[in-house]
A protein has these predicted regions:
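PLP-dependent amino-acid enzyme catalytic core
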Residues: 1-180
């Protein structure tokens, strides 16, 4: 699990042990000699977003969060929904209209409430901020919450451990940039 690096993740205690679903330490395969590919689609919810979600939800569990909200257009929402389900935290994911029905089904499959918001992703974020003010929900924002990044940084620790060296170049998928 990525929590082999928990000492570097700014987490209190060992609540992560009850949250983790074995994310991290994904295989690295050689492609064309000097190019290596890290297989982060082999995470519990099929996305590198599990790295951040596992750590963020561990923090939420440690501080006693009962309900969270998040804006997402897909993978982060699925990951947060999954880890909240494992942790017993109520979860609402606000998605913009046009979000893949499969992503919505995955979010709901983990027991979270998926709410389609007319407009853009920014409108979803506005709804989440209002839920924080009105209901006291925790905003599990995967773009700005530093605990999400505490998890995604395990990517490079793993890469170093697996290759036994620092790669000369790293090319990563960006999405909205949460792994960068």
């Amino acid at each position: 699990s990525q929590f082999r690096y928990h000492a570097f993740m700014n987490l209190d205690g060992d609540v992560w042990r009850r949250v983790s679903m074995g994310e991290g330490m994904t295989p690295i395969v050689s492609y064309n000699g000097n190019v290596f590919l890290k297989m982060d689609f082999m995470m519990p919810t099929l996305s590198f977003k599990d790295r951040g979600a596992a750590t963020l939800v561990s923090h939420m569990k440690a501080i006693g969060v009962k309900k969270c909200v998040q804006d997402s257009s897909g993978n982060a929402g699925v990951a947060v929904a999954a880890y909240c389900a494992r942790s017993g935290i109520a979860c609402e994911i606000y998605v913009p209209e046009g979000t893949s029905p499969n992503k919505i089904a995955m979010i709901e499959g983990f027991g979270a409430k998926a709410v389609v918001v007319p407009g853009t992703r920014d409108h979803c974020a506005e709804v989440c901020r209002s839920k924080v003010k009105e209901e006291g929900a925790y905003y599990a924002n995967h773009v700005y919450n530093p605990y999400f990044y505490e998890g995604t940084k395990a990517y490079i620790y793993e890469t170093f451990e697996q290759l036994k060296r620092i790669p000369r170049h790293i090319f990563i998928e960006l999405g909205n940039g949460t792994l960068f």
